[in-house]
Amino acid sequence: GAWQQIPEISKAVHDAGAMLLVDTVTALGGIPVEVDAWNIDAIYSGTQKCLSCPPGLSPTSFSPRAMDVIMNRKTKVQSWYLDVSMLANYWGQNRVYHHTGPINMTWGLYEALCLIHEEGLENCFARHLRNHRALKAGLAAIGIKYSAQEGHQLPMLNAVYVPFAVQNL
């Protein structure tokens, strides 16, 4: 549960000529995620965490640079189902039927995003932080410590040390 400094990591990755992939399965909807400002090439999430939607979808985004690499790869993707270049053709003139979309999940995500919009992003972020602080205070009261350093704890992923006395129960 450590909050990573993505802007600094992004700069180092791009300075080295590489591309940046970011996992926001837990974070999306719980803290600010600035895909374009942080120069993220590929990012993915899950709907079942801070988006408060049933599991089953993985929102993704690719930068133009990442899409260029995807569309011009030299080797064939071994899994037809995971071939992003075929998925990208849904929006082009060479549309290829890839699979039946999970319409019920898409509507579920739409409704979850509507609820976040109604609450307001800043209020949503503040709610997750309040809940984190309340949990942290309760855990501290019974002697449980966080694994991430103070100031680097991700509010929605609370990784803690298991007390030695209960490790073998």
Task: Set out the residue ranges of the language-model regions.
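Catalytic PLP-binding core of fold-type I/II PLP enzymes
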Residues: W3-V35
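Conserved active-site segment immediately N-terminal to the catalytic lysine
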Residues: D36-Q48, S58
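General structural feature for long, well-ordered alpha-helical segments within catalytic domains
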Residues: A2-Q5, I31, N39, M105-G108, ...
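General beta-strand structural signal in soluble alpha/beta enzymes
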Residues: L20-T24, I43-G46, C53
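Short, well-ordered, mixed-charge alpha-helical segments that flank or form enzyme active sites
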Residues: G1-W3, L28-P32, A37, L51-P54, ...
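Active-site C-terminal subdomain of aminotransferase-like
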Residues: Q48-A137, A141
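Conserved PLP-binding catalytic core of the aspartate aminotransferase-like
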Residues: K145-L169
